[in-house]
């Protein structure tokens, strides 16, 4: 098995791999949607699969690895060929035993598993690199600066399909969890509405639900269930609207700043538990809270450190004893600093000797977040769920929006490119996820009706 898989991966050269990944519209499925073909242009010594899936309510990657182990390993080999990497690492948690058992007998030379503890935020790209390789990415730098390219499980599986079948990204696997009748992990057409996705899980079980796109720590508030599934939709979390996780996300920025100025006690727990600070970054959330509260404390260099915040939300959801959100403050600062084209430059300090002991055990995190009553297994189903309407966002990735290459009224088939980015621009094409008629084209999306 190992020999056959290794031989198959040698059928394609680096340029072919990158071209097919680009044509298929593969983007980072676990983050902001960085185009995968651009990452594969880097030349590094290590390709790392971030399979930690540290958000406690999401159950996608851990289950996909168990049932698609061969495809995942072939994808790692294609990525290694494209990047020139000599080493491939799949970093996953010890508790993912089904995945470990499926992957271990298939590992070829040059690819290994790295077992992670069940802590948050082990799935943060920079933290995963540190835990799996011992290398520390400097603040404001990319993983390539330390010789590593990182993708998550679903991205690597999409790379395999793109290379072997020239199959574009038209489906997304996501978890529906929390206050739903049937917690589930399922694969749906890109562009299906979250309203339909919720119905597939049996609907909400509370009278006045709130919704989060993604996990409880980093996911954003959903204001409309008509929002379509995109290439980066990680999950649909349903909770009572009265739940603290929903209420915090509903706070406006003025309230966030007012709370910070009123109750901050300068205990510095937010900094002591900040994962980026622990590995040597200059970022100190308590000093940034102080800076927005008291102008005389706001030096230019201090404010710029906000640009290095990963928005992992440890400071707000775990560290702060009085309900302040340093993360939201950092997000505001980042928006203003980026609007002025400011960039951060600063040192990589020695890592904290207590760093590995200050990451948050996920069991404790679930309790701290008030999720014990809403935490479910959400088993994976391989059912193909159809839909009669898809709304395909033209910007499901970092970079320029895709430009429609079809006309209203045109018949399209699943897998057909309906929008692409200009040559040389950062971005990724968008493909039809169902057969149908283009019913509407706007600046933001293309709507396809089955027919």
From Swiss-Prot:
[4Fe-4S] cluster 1 binds at residues 264, 267, 270, 274. Pathway: Polyol metabolism; 1,2-propanediol degradation. Changing residue 270 to A: Colorless protein, no 4Fe-4S centers, no cobalamin reductase activity. Binds 2 [4Fe-4S] clusters. The two centers are coupled but must possess different redox potentials. Binds one FMN non-covalently per monomer. PANTHER family: ION-TRANSLOCATING OXIDOREDUCTASE COMPLEX SUBUNIT C. Changing residue 312 to A: Colorless protein, no 4Fe-4S centers, no cobalamin reductase activity. It comes from Citrobacter freundii. [4Fe-4S] cluster 2 binds at residues 309, 312, 315, 320. Belongs to the PduS cobalamin reductase family. One of its GO terms (cellular component) is membrane. InterPro entries: 4Fe4S_Fe-S-bd, Helical_ferredxn, Ion_transpt_RnfC/RsxC, Nuo51_FMN-bd, Nuo51_FMN-bd_sf, PduS, RnfC_N, Soluble_ligand-bd. Monomer, forms a complex with PduO. Interacts with PduT, probably via the N-terminus of PduS. GO terms for molecular function: 4 iron, 4 sulfur cluster binding; electron transfer activity; metal ion binding. This is Cobalamin reductase PduS. Its cofactor is [4Fe-4S] cluster; FMN. A bifunctional cobalamin reductase that converts cob(III)alamin to cob(II)alamin and then to cob(I)alamin in the bacterial microcompartment (BMC) dedicated to 1,2-propanediol (1,2-PD) degradation. PduS and PduO allow regeneration of the adenosylcobalamin cofactor within the BMC. Cobalamin reduction probably occurs spontaneously in the presence of free reduced flavin nucleotides, this protein may be involved in electron transfer for this reduction. Residues 255-284, 300-330 form the 4Fe-4S ferredoxin-type domain. Keywords: 4Fe-4S, Bacterial microcompartment, Electron transport, Flavoprotein, FMN, Iron, Iron-sulfur, Metal-binding, NAD, Repeat, Transport. GO terms for biological process: propanediol catabolic process.
